[in-house]
UniProtKB/Swiss-Prot annotation:
This is Phosphoribosylaminoimidazole-succinocarboxamide synthase. Belongs to the SAICAR synthetase family. Signal peptide: none annotated. Keywords: ATP-binding, Ligase, Nucleotide-binding, Purine biosynthesis. One of its GO terms (molecular function) is ATP binding. The gene is purC. It catalyses: 5-amino-1-(5-phospho-D-ribosyl)imidazole-4-carboxylate + L-aspartate + ATP = (2S)-2-[5-amino-1-(5-phospho-beta-D-ribosyl)imidazole-4-carboxamido]succinate + ADP + phosphate + 2 H(+). It comes from Hamiltonella defensa subsp. Acyrthosiphon pisum (strain 5AT). The keyword Chloroplast does not apply. NCBIfam families: purC.
Length: 237
C-alpha cells in the first residue's frame, strides 16, 4: 500500500496516510525522548528494533484474541495499521512499584503489586500527563463508560498474555502503557508496545533493560533493547 503525506509526527514515530482512508503507515524513527519531549537523542537502529519488537508483540496479542491495529509489516521500520479514532488516554498496568507510582506513594522500588494496579493518564505533555479517574473521563467526554470498561479489560488481558512471556525469558514486566482507539465502533489496541513504553528488568540482577536506561543516564540503551528482543524471540534483521 502506497505511503502518502505525513499526518502526524510524534516523539518517536511518524504517521502517514495511504490511498485507503482506513489505513495508515507507522514509521519508527531513531529518536528517543524524555522529560515530556524536552530531551531528544537519536540511537542507531532503534527504529528498526522497536518496529520489529512491536510487530512481534502485537502478533502475540492477536493470537490471544486481543484486537490490535496491526495489519502487516511493510519494511524494517514501517508498519501498516488500521486508522483508529484514538482516546486521549494512556492505560497503565503496574506489576511492580516503579516510576511515578513509586515516587507518589513513597514505595520501595520493585515492590510486588498483587493484584496489579491499573492507572489512567491524560495524554497532555503541557500538563505532564496527569493521572485521572474514570469519572474524569466520563465528565470531560474523553471516553464513555462502556469504552473505559473495555480498555481496562483488555489491559489486564494484555498483562495475562505478556507477563508469562517475559517471565519465561527470565525477565520481569514491571509495568507498561497502552493506548486504545475505535475502529468501526470497536475498541482496539493502538500505538505500540516496545521497551520505550514499558519497564523490563532482568529477573536475577534486576538490571533495567528499557527506556529508563535513557531517562536515568545508565547507558547501553540499544544493547538492552536488543537483549530483551533476543530473549523473548523477536526476529531482528
Amino acid at each position: 500500500m502506497q505511503k502518502l503525506s505525513e499526518v502526524y509526527r510524534g516523539k518517536a514515530k511518524t504517521v502517514y496516510a495511504t490511498e485507503n482512508p482506513d489505513f495508515l503507515v507507522l514509521e519508527f524513527r531513531n529518536d528517543t525522548s524524555a522529560l515530556d519531549g524536552k530531551r531528544i537523542e537519536q540511537f542507531y537502529r532503534k527504529g528498526i528494533i522497536n518496529n520489529q519488537f512491536n510487530h512481534f508483540i502485537m502478533l502475540k496479542l492477536e493470537e490471544a484474541g486481543i484486537p490490535t491495529q496491526l495489519e502487516r509489516l511493510l519494511s524494517e521500520n514501517e508498519l501498516l495499521v488500521k486508522k483508529l479514532d484514538m482516546f486521549p488516554l494512556e492505560s497503565v498496568i503496574r506489576n511492580r512499584a516503579a516510576g511515578s507510582l513509586e515516587k507518589r506513594l513513597a514505595l520501595q522500588e520493585g515492590l510486588l503489586l498483587d493484584p496489579p494496579i491499573y492507572d489512567l493518564f491524560l495524554k497532555n505533555d503541557s500538563l505532564h500527563d496527569p493521572i485521572v479517574t474514570e469519572s474524569y473521563c466520563e465528565t470531560f467526554g474523553w471516553a464513555s463508560t462502556a469504552h473505559l470498561v473495555k480498555m481496562k479489560e483488555l489491559s489486564y488481558k494484555v498483562n495475562d498474555v505478556l507477563s508469562p512471556l517475559f517471565d519465561a525469558a527470565d525477565l520481569i514486566l514491571v509495568d507498561f502503557k497502552l493506548e486504545f482507539g475505535l475502529f468501526k465502533g470497536e475498541v482496539i489496541l493502538g500505538d505500540e508496545f516496545s521497551p520505550d513504553g514499558c519497564r523490563i528488568w532482568d529477573k536475577t540482577t534486576l538490571n533495567k533493560l528499557d527506556k529508563d536506561r535513557f531517562r536515568q543516564n545508565l547507558g547501553g540503551l540499544i544493547e538492552a533493547y536488543e537483549e530483551v528482543a533476543k530473549r523473548i524471540g523477536v526476529p531482528l534483521n
